[in-house]
């Protein structure tokens, strides 16, 4: 270069499509942690579990049947878990933060799997006993069959909303 | 080259580590379709479901309780499904063929999910009624409590062996 003849030659900027080595990464499906669909699922789980718990508690003799006591315990656990996850989802949405940490997602999968299994087991046991009382023994005149049925149905609905959460989070963990 | 002076010079073969553009692909975990572990899981599911079915059928009054009839139906379905999958796994092992077709894996996931849910629901309903008869009403002297308990436990064990099949196949589908 000739120092006595300095010149600034305008040069084109290099193309900036560097992309930072794009990883193949799945998009956010609604219902995954940290999405609006996920928050809606959590709130649905919580509401159905609260209704199931309240209805079962409003019968005075639920404690004489082990399965109904178990339903109350399982719905309490489901309420606490879904409420905690709803708060986390709401926070993630507010601060626009993605919940994609491997450890966090694993924790969600295990928690969802355990609570879904417990809630479903409680709902099935209660359904078996409700059908036994109502259809097989025909003793609905001495028992709160309607309330038992409604509480069982609400527990099933709560499980029905935990399952997509579990499957989508498991999918997210597997497809990382 | 001088044609009057032919010579064969031994040359080194080029390195053959061409790798054929290695795709990122998960390895075969034992328990997935087409593995020896998968075949063992299928045979376990089948055996436990057959034992649960046989024990429940050996009680003469199972048909008076809806949940016990449902257990019989669910274990029959589980037997058929697990036997079919065991045959497919055995065939895949014999001809050393990998079961990695997307459609086939999806079918396995749906079938495993449905049969696992049905078997678990039947086991939970039977468990609820068995506990009701044995612990809450204390009428084991008039009922086959031991047989009910054993059949329920076998159904739970069958479900316990379907779950890893379902989770591993779902993992395989998600991580493709």
Curated annotation (Swiss-Prot), chains A, B:
The keyword Transmembrane helix applies. It is a multi-pass membrane protein. It is found in: Cell membrane. Residues 57-67, 124-152 are extracellular. It comes from the Eukaryota. Its main location: membrane. Keywords: Cell membrane, Membrane, Transmembrane, Transmembrane helix. GO terms for cellular component: plasma membrane. The chain crosses the membrane at residues 36-56, 68-88, 103-123, 153-173. Residues 1-35, 89-102, 174-176 are cytoplasmic. It holds the Pfam family CASP_dom. InterPro entries: CASP_dom, CASPL-5. Homodimer and heterodimers. Belongs to the Casparian strip membrane proteins (CASP) family. This is CASP-like protein 5A1. It comes from Ginkgo biloba.
């Amino acid at each position: 270069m000739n120092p006595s003849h300095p010149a600034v030659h305008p040069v084109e900027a290099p193309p900036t499509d560097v992309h930072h080595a794009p990883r193949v990464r799945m998009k956010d499906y609604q219902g995954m942690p940290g999405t609006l669909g996920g928050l809606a699922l959590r709130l649905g789980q919580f509401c159905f579990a609260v209704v199931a718990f309240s209805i079962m508690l409003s019968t005075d003799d639920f404690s004489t049947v082990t399965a109904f006591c178990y339903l109350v315990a399982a719905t309490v656990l489901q309420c606490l878990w879904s409420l905690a996850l709803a708060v986390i989802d709401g926070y993630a949405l507010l601060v626009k933060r993605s919940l994609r940490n491997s450890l966090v997602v694993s924790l969600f999968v295990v928690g969802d799997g355990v609570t879904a299994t417990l809630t479903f087991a409680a709902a099935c046991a209660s359904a078996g006993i409700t059908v036994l009382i109502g259809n097989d023994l025909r003793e609905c005149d001495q028992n709160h069959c309607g309330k038992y049925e409604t509480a069982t149905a609400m527990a099933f609905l709560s499980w029905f909303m935990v399952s997509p959460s579990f499957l989508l989070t498991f999918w997210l963990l597997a497809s990382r």
